[in-house]
């Protein structure tokens, strides 16, 4: 799957430059939109690809290939003797991810193993896309370039190596948060890379994009690896300075950006630098200044559309609740006598937040690569991280809920299940299975409505619901199957989570009508839902912004940094939106089911709709 941007000036009679854009891990072709729009507005044909395992591509991530070893420093700086070249075992997805930076054109010492495994296509489909772009009659084959972000930078290196020495070899490579390697890692005598620009994020959460150093500073700039790349001495090395010659393809530059890993794709400084680089290498028309950038307007409008679509779910719910069948999903709230004192609520809230913070870094990474799951069933890589975390929290919540229920029963409480948001007023002494089923049908109708809206948006505008990164996309059969696999665990987690948060968070505001009552409930619910994650945000970024190191790397080791730390920028806003939906639906229906099932479905949709699949 790809998206092609073609300016009106591109014809067979007047061919124009062509650029292949390759997205990063957990993203898709639409994440490249900022670069694509800016390049196309300046006269280039731009092809944005869904790489293996991402977006709508049917080939899984496993098609990149893998071997049974990994390198724990930059390639070409490793050795068996010092332990930086290691044999690995475990789950296939772990081996695949440990070989992201192992590239197909590296020496066989790296790309094959004794078990017959190999790196088959580290371009992740990029080479096929590049060949397609080069063959277009409105593209000048002498003016081709590549740019990739994160995982896409390894694909970019691979495409450039594959077409080196051909009539269509790329004249420039722009790496958005890329890893470097020594010339000794590959056949440097026969493989060369023309005019390489590295956009370096100062606060990159991934250690391999910082050369496994704690921070990005001048010491990193002057390392042997970096000076070899620039073609200069340590004394000559400087940020934001071009070395070499564009004419012979030796131009090199490292641009330091004051941003983090994920935001590099839309960083104005980086975009302007890249556009100038493309002008110098493939003749991109800069009549429109590099600083004239409109892509964020598109992102803002799509964000508004997504939020409006999600908010309209509440209107659909209200409409459905007026029908005789769904009106029975509305229950009265438990009596005010069961409201917890403020002190007891704060103790529970603090415990909840600390528990989430203590388990998030470990369980997400454990599930990401090491948890022994059937990989032909559980194929979502980041999804497995959340699955692992949710499973642990489910066990904890089940135990504490059972203990709490038994205590209430001994005290003679009459509204046990209703008090937890799980039962009806008519039969508060037992689980409300009928209520659950009715609420599930209600949520199914709401989701069907949202899917139709999304389908219209995709067909009419070639856009899904997102903000830079993929959120809601239409499903193919494989991804819908994954949605069905993960949804039961997500649903159980959110039902228990809302039962532990919404019901105990009842306060005087719960019984107040209108916005004042909603706000008085929401801030408590939001704090408990997102507070633990905010603790992790502070732990990760305070020492990082102080130029010490990412907090996760300092406290837990670099194994627990990277993907799930960089995900926090997406995860926190998602949870805040879920807290609004869950608070509103709990106050409206008197049970946790509608809010929990809605949040679970949306969260599962985000994880399975377009992100990485093995």
Region roles according to the model:
Residues 310-322, 403-404, 494-498:
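C-terminal membrane-cytosol helix-exit motif in multi-pass small-molecule transporters
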Residues 285-313, 321-346:
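Cytosolic-side membrane-insertion boundary helix
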Residues 184-193, 307, 317-324:
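Conserved serine/cysteine hydrolase catalytic core
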Residues 315-336, 567-575, 601-608:
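Contiguous hydrophobic segments
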Residues 350-614:
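Alpha-helical transmembrane segments of integral membrane proteins
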Residues 1-294:
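Soluble extramembrane regions of membrane proteins in the secretory/endomembrane system
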């Amino acid at each position: 799957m790809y998206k092609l941007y073609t300016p009106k000036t591109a014809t067979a009679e007047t061919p124009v430059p062509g650029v292949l854009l390759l997205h990063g891990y957990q993203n898709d072709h639409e994440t490249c939109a900022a670069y694509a729009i800016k390049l196309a507005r300046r006269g280039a044909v731009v092809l944005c690809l869904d790489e293996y395992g991402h977006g709508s591509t049917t080939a899984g991530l496993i098609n990149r290939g893998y071997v049974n070893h990994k390198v724990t420093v930059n390639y070409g700086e490793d050795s068996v003797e010092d332990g930086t070249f290691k044999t690995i075992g475990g789950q296939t997805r772990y081996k695949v991810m440990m070989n992201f930076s192992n590239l197909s054109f590296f020496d066989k010492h790296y790309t094959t193993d004794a078990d017959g495994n190999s790196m088959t296509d580290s371009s992740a489909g990029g080479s096929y896309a590049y060949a397609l772009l080069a063959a277009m009659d409105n593209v000048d084959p002498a003016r081709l370039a590549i740019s990739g972000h994160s995982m896409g930078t390894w694909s970019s290196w691979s495409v450039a190596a594959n077409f080196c020495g051909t009539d269509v070899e790329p004249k420039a490579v722009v790496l958005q948060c890329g890893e470097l390697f020594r010339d000794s890692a590959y056949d440097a005598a026969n493989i060369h890379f023309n005019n390489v620009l590295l956009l370096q994020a100062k606060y990159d959460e991934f250690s391999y994009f910082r050369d496994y150093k704690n921070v990005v500073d001048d010491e990193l700039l002057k390392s042997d690896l970096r000076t070899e790349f620039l073609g200069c001495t340590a004394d000559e090395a400087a940020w934001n300075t071009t070395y070499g010659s564009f004419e012979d393809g030796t131009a090199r530059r490292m641009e330091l950006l004051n941003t983090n890993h994920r935001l590099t794709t839309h960083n104005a400084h980086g975009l302007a630098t890249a556009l100038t680089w493309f002008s110098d290498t493939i003749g991109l028309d800069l009549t429109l200044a590099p600083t004239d950038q409109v892509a964020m307007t598109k992102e803002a409008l799509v964000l508004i559309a997504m939020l409006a679509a999600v908010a309209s779910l509440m209107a659909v719910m209200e409409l459905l609740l007026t029908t005789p069948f769904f009106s029975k999903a509305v229950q009265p709230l438990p009596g005010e006598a069961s409201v917890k004192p403020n002190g007891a609520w704060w103790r529970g809230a603090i415990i909840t937040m600390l528990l989430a913070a203590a388990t998030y870094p470990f369980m997400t990474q454990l599930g990401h690569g090491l948890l022994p799951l059937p990989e032909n069933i559980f194929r979502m890589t980041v999804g497995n991280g959340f699955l692992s975390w949710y499973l642990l929290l489910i066990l904890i919540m089940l135990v504490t809920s059972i203990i709490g229920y038994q205590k209430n029963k001994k005290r003679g409480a009459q509204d046990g299940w209703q008090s937890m948001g799980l039962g009806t007023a008519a039969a508060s002494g037992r689980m409300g299975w009928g209520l659950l089923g009715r609420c599930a049908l209600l949520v199914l109708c709401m989701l069907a409505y949202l899917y139709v809206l999304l389908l219209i948006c995709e067909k009419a505008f070639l856009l899904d619901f997102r903000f830079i990164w993929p959120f809601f996309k239409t499903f193919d059969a494989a991804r819908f199957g994954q949605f069905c696999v993960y949804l039961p665990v997500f649903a159980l987690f959110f039902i228990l989570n809302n039962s532990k948060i919404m019901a105990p968070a009842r306060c005087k505001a719960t019984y107040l009508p209108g916005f004042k009552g909603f706000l008085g409930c929401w801030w408590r619910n939001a704090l408990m839902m997102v507070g633990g994650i905010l603790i992790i945000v502070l732990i990760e970024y305070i020492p990082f912004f102080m130029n010490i190191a990412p907090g996760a790397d300092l406290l837990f080791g670099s194994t627990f940094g990277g993907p799930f730390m960089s995900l926090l920028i997406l995860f926190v806003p998602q949870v805040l939106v879920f807290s609004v939906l869950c608070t509103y639906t709990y106050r409206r229906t008197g049970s946790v089911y509608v809010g929990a099932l809605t949040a679970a479905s949306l969260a599962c949709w985000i994880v399975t709709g377009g992100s990485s699949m093995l």
